[in-house]
Structure formats: C-alpha cells, structure tokens
Amino acid sequence: NLFQFEKLIKKMTGKSGMLWYSAYGCYCGWGGQGRPKDATDRCCFVHDCCYGKVTGCNPKMDIYTYSVDNGNIVCGGTNPCKKQICECDRAAAICFRDNLKTYDSKTYWKYPKKNCKEESEPC
C-alpha cells in the first residue's frame, strides 16, 4: 500500500516519499500524462505501468509482506497479486535511489501538469 511504499522509499533513499516524490515531474504523484521529464520521473512512469498490470488486488490499499535483508528489500508472502505490488514498489524505490544525483527539485517539484501535454509513450 502507499504507506509501505513510503517506507521502502525512505529505506532506499533516506528521503521522504511524500516530500520528494508526491508532486514531481509528470508522473510522480496522483495520475500521470505526457512524457517523463527525467530519470526520476521515469521511475514513476514505470511504477504507474507496473501498477497498471496488477489485477485482483488494490496496489494503493492492500498490505503486502516484505523484509529488509542487508539493505535489500525482499518481497514475500503467498499472495501473488500482493507480491507483484511489492515488486513494483521495490523496483521504484531502487530506481529513486539510483537516480538521486539527477533529482532536480528546482525544475520538476510541483511541475505544472499543463506542461505534460506530449503524447504519452506506451508502457
């Protein structure tokens, strides 16, 4: 669920998901359109696509099982749908970590959605 996603982001990046990723670029936060603006925004685009492939459960609400082993997120549990949600969140948190150096709050934090009008690329 979104609370767990926040925890995974904090674990991987040391940053608050709400404060860093809830209103960034064209895809980080609620909804998404246009083309991703940078590598961080692309993490959110891929995460949105990943959630879009989940069927049979609610990615934003359902609780999944995970652990952290030597700094690595390990998704667990027996429910394949919930495990898929965890894998989406895990991949995004790692993507955020790997792209911290190019995170550009001056340009893309609270980026106007009116600037996200390009045709979206397919997932």
Curated annotation (Swiss-Prot):
Role according to the record: PLA2 catalyzes the calcium-dependent hydrolysis of the 2-acyl groups in 3-sn-phosphoglycerides.
A GO molecular function held by the record: phospholipid binding
Cofactor note: Binds 1 Ca(2+) ion per subunit.
Impact noted for substituting residue 53 to E: No effect on catalytic efficiency
Enzyme active site: 47, 89
Protein name, as recorded: Basic phospholipase A2 APP-D49
Effect caused by changing residue 11 to E: 75% decrease in catalytic efficiency
Tissue expr: Expressed by the venom gland.
Major enzyme class: hydrolase
Protein family according to the UniProt entry: Belongs to the phospholipase A2 family. Group II subfamily. D49 sub-subfamily.
Pfam families in alphabetical order: Phospholip_A2_1
Keywords from the named record: Calcium, Disulfide bond, Hydrolase, Lipid degradation, Lipid metabolism, Lipoprotein, Metal-binding, Palmitate, Secreted
Recorded superkingdom: Eukaryota
Effect of residue 6 to R: 75% decrease in catalytic efficiency
Keyword Amino-acid biosynthesis: no
Species for this entry: Agkistrodon piscivorus piscivorus
Assigned GO CC terms: extracellular region
Residues reported to bind Ca(2+): 27, 29, 31, 48
Reactions the enzyme catalyzes: a 1,2-diacyl-sn-glycero-3-phosphocholine + H2O = a 1-acyl-sn-glycero-3-phosphocholine + a fatty acid + H(+)
Assembly: Monomer or homodimer.
Outcome of swapping residue 15 to E: 60% decrease in catalytic efficiency
Post-translational modification, as annotated: Acylation causes dimerization.
Subcellular location: Secreted
CC cofactor: Ca(2+)
GO biological process: arachidonate secretion; lipid catabolic process; negative regulation of T cell proliferation; phospholipid metabolic process
